[in-house]
């Protein structure tokens, strides 16, 4: 189809395919039109920040056990890649959480699935203040908190008794 295949240099030793251009990861992501992941949902979750940083859609080829996000099966890969090369695809935009955890082990970033903050090995409960758009939502004391996007509502949040949200819902659990 005339599309160039770019691959980051890291897996080069395990993949030697004619016609593939190997580049440093940053350069590969800058030049690519689509990020192709081969694995399962965990692989997509791992690459979601790259997708966000470079404003590139992800096409997930499912090799894992769970394919909620990696919806393309290996048997469909050739047809899907041909469709992408022809520009015949749609992008399913998903909600992301921007998270800032303050305190001793502070963290800042984006989450496609969920954010889980727990007391860890501490024997006592911890205090939480949860803000949304810089507005205090709740302050409480407990073992931890899970905040999940609609995408993440089928993961840890569901296992903890939370509801399943439609992927296009504009809200969090």
Which sequence ranges carry the predicted segments?
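Short glycine-/acidic-enriched loop or helix-start segments at secondary-structure transitions
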Residues: 17, 46-49, 70, 127, ...
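Catalytic core of DAGKc-family lipid kinases
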Residues: 66-143
């Amino acid at each position: 189809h005339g599309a160039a295949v770019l691959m980051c240099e890291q897996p080069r030793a395990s993949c030697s395919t004619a016609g593939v251009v190997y580049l440093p990861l940053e350069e590969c992501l800058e030049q690519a039109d689509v990020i192709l992941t081969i694995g399962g949902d965990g692989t997509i979750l791992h690459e979601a920040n790259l997708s966000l940083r470079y404003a590139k859609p992800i096409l997930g080829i499912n090799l894992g056990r769970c394919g909620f996000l990696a919806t393309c099966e290996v048997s469909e890969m050739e047809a899907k890649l041909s469709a992408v090369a022809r520009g015949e695809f749609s992008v399913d935009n998903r909600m992301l959480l921007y998270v800032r955890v303050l305190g001793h082990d502070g963290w800042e970033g984006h989450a496609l699935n969920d954010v889980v903050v727990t007391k860890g090995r501490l024997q006592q409960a911890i205090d939480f203040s949860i803000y949304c758009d810089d507005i205090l939502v709740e302050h409480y004391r407990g073992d931890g908190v899970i905040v999940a996007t609609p995408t993440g509502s089928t993961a840890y949040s569901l296992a903890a008794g939370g509801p399943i949200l439609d992927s296009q819902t504009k809200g969090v659990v």
